[in-house]
Amino acid sequence: MTQTPANSHAIDSALLGLEDDESGSRIVREELKLLSTVKTALAGARARAEAPDEPKDDARLLEIREEISTARPDDLPALLEQMHNLGALRAQRGKGVVGVVDPNSPYFAHLRLEEDVPNGKPRKRDLLIGNKGYVDSASGVRVVDWRNAPVSKIFYRYVEGDDYEEELGDRIVEGRVLLRRSVAIVGGELRRVSTPEGVFLCDAQGKWRRLDPTRAKLRTEGTKAKLGDSNADGLTRADKVLPAIAAMIDKEQYNLITRPGTGIIAIQGSAGSGKTTVGLHRVAYLAETDPVRYRPERMMVVVPNEALIHYVRRVLPDLGVDGVPVTTFRRFATRTAVGLFPKLPLSISEETPTVVTRAKQHPGMLRVIRDAVEEMASDVRARLDAFADKWAGAGTVVKAWDKTAGDALKVRLTNLSAWADGNKDLGVSAKSLSQATCSALEALLTDARKQARAVLSTWDEVLTNRGRLATHMPDLNEMQMNQVHAWCVRQMRVRAEGERDGETPSVDTEDFAILLRIWQELRGALLGSDEKPMRFTHLLVDEVQDASAVELRVLLDLTGKEPAATLAGDVAQRMLDDGDDRGEFKWSDLLSELGMETAAIDPLKVSYRSTAEITSFARGVLGPHAHDAEPIATRHGPMVELFPFSSQGEAVAFLADALKELYASEPNANVAIVARFAQQAQVYFEGLERAEVPGVRRVAKQDFSWEAGVDVTDVRQTKGLEFDEVVLVDTNAASYPDAANTRHALYVGATRASHQLWCIASDKPSVLVEEGIKAAHALVQPAS
C-alpha cells in the first residue's frame, strides 16, 4: 500500500500556526508538497521492488553467475551483457535505491537552479541534497550525495540569489541560485525549513512557527560584533589571545600568587577560573622577588599539550620573565630518557592495550617501583649483616648503612664507601676498620653499585613481576593482570632478542616515566644533556588531573628533597578513554600517593572565562560529578543552543551558513568546531572546506595558529584553551552516552567557549546535552 504523503492535510489547508504568515505558509507548503512527491516516488519504487517477478530475477541472476564461473571465454561477453541488463531492470523496479535512501530522512536541502544553456533558454531544475543519491526520472525526483556529487558544491558555496560558475565533471556550468533551503525531515515528517526569509519550525502537535532569527546566529561578545575590522580596538587576533590578565586577578588569586616558593600549592579550580593565570603570575612573582634563587632557567612549566606550550611561551615574556623552560611531560621524559639510556629502542608501540596503559599509569606503580628498590636495599643490608659477622670490627658498617636511609640506592652505597675512606660523616666512626676489612667492604660495595646502576634490568623486573603488580593494583582483575603481564613479558623478550616474528623492539609512552622514576630511586638525580644533575627551584604543573602519580613524583624530585611546586588541576576535567574505569580524580588520593597528605588544596571559585549560561550548561552536563560549589560566573551572554539534525550533511550546511554570516560581520572571530573523535572532526572539516567557509583549518596535533578563523578539531586537542565561540558537533547519544568519562569530555569541550556555545546533533541528541540545556535555561536571566 502506498504511504500517505507527509502532512498531506496541511498542503491544501491553512497551516496551523502560520495562518497570518502568508510568505511562511507559501514556503512551508512548497516543501510539504515536495516531500510528498519524494515519498510517493520512494513508495512506488519499493512496491516495484516487491513485485512478483523479483524472485525470478534473483534466481536468473544466480544462474548467470554460475554459468560465468564455468563458461568458455567466447561465451563470457554475452553472459555479462545478460547480467548487466537484468541488473538494470531490477534497479528500475527500485531495488538498489530504496534500500539505500532512508525514507524517514531522504534529503536535507532543496536547491533550485537556473542553468545557462548555450544558444538556448536558461533551464530550471530542482535538486535535493541528501546522504545518498537517488534519481527517479518519471517523477522528477533527484537526490544527490552531499559528499560526492559535484553539483552539491553549489549548495555549499553559494547563497540564494548568487550567480554561480563551477566546473562539474569536464564542463563549466554557469547559472543562478533561485532557491536555497535547508530542511529537517524526521520520521518522514517535515519539521523545519530554513530559508533567507526565515526559519520555520513544526512542534510535536503539528503547529508551525517562525523561529527567533537571532538563535541561529553566531555572534561575538560585546563591542566586537560591531568592529568590522582588525584594528577597531587596536588589537590583532594574536594580541587578543593574550589578554591583560594581570588586571583580572582577584584577592583569592593574589594570595596564592604571593605565597613563598617552597612547599606544595595545590590549586583546584573549575574551567576558566584562572588556574593557569595564577600559576604563571606566581612564576613571574618568584622571579621578581628573589631573582637569584628563582632565575628563569631554574624554574620549569609543564603543560598538557603543545598548544599550551606556545601560549605560555608568549605570556611569560609579557609578565617580565623570559627563558623559563616550558614543556609537556611526554616531551621532557622522552628527551631525558633517550639521553640517559642510549640503548633504549626509539620505536613507540602503537598497539599498547588500554589495560596496559592503565597499569603503567596506575597510582600503585609508585609502590611497585619502591618495593623493587627496597628489596634491592634489603639484599645489600643482608650482605652487610653477613659481612659484619665475618670481619672483626665491622659492626659499625651496618650502623653507618642505616644512617644513609632516605637517599637513592647508589647514593647510599657511594656514601658508605666514602665513610669507610674517612671522607663522609655518618655519625659513627670508621677508625675501627682494618685495611683488610675496608678492602673487602669496597669489593662488596663495588658489586652492589653495579646492580644499582642497572636501571634497564630493574625496569624489566618491575614490569614482569606479576605478584608485585597484582599486590599494588588490586582493582585490576585476574584477566586484566594476565594481559598486562603477557604484554610486558613479550616486550622484554623482543627487546632482549631483537626483531623476532616481525616484531620490532619497542617501548610504550608510559615507560619513560617509569624508567626515570627507577633511575631516581636507584641512582638519584636525573642528568641533563651536560651530564650534570637536573635541579629546579620551582615547578608549575598544569592539568595535574591527567598526570600519573609516577609522572608527578618524577617532576617533584627535580626540586630536591623538599619539593617546591605549584600544582593546578580540576577534578571535572579528567579525560579518560572509553573502557578506562579508573574513576574520578581525587586530590586527596593523589597527594597521599605522593606522600604529601598535609598539603592544602586551595579552591578557585570564580569562573572568568565563560558566561553564566555556559557555566550552568557545563555544570548540568557533569551531573553527579559536578563541583561541590557552584562556580561564580561574572557575566551573561547568549543562551546555549541545541540544533538537532538528521545527518552530518544537514549539520554542515547549517553550520557553513552560520559561519559565513559571522565572518562577514566579524572577520576577527575565533571559532572552534569540536568533535568527540578525530574522525568526526575530519568529516566536518571536509564539508566546511567544500562549502568554502573562510579561514577553516584542521587541527589534529595541537597546531593551533591563534589567528582568526575556524579551527576544526577534537576535544582532546583543546585542553586548557579558550575560543570566542565553540560549536560542539555530533553531540549525539552515540558519541556522548551517559557515562562519567563522556560527561567529563563534554564538560571540557563546552568550557572552551568564552562567549557563545552551540551543540549540534546529527542524530538522536545525547541526554547529557539535554540535561545541560535544561540547567542553562533554569538560570535566572538578568533584567534587560
Regions found by a protein language model. Give the residues of each.
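Extended, charged low-complexity regulatory segments
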Residues: 1-246, 250-255, 781-784
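P-loop NTPase Walker
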Residues: 2-10, 26-43, 176, 186, ...
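A structural signal for short, well-ordered beta-strand segments and their strand-loop junctions
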Residues: 108-112, 266, 567, 758-761
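Short, flexible beta-strand-to-coil junctions
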Residues: 112-118, 520-523, 677
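Phosphate/oxyanion-binding active-site loops and adjacent basic polyanion-contact surfaces
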Residues: 241, 245, 275-279, 507-511, ...
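Alpha-helical nucleic-acid-binding subdomain
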Residues: 287-540, 545-554, 563, 572, ...
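Conserved helicase motor core of SF1/SF2 NTP-dependent helicases
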Residues: 292, 297, 306-310, 314, ...
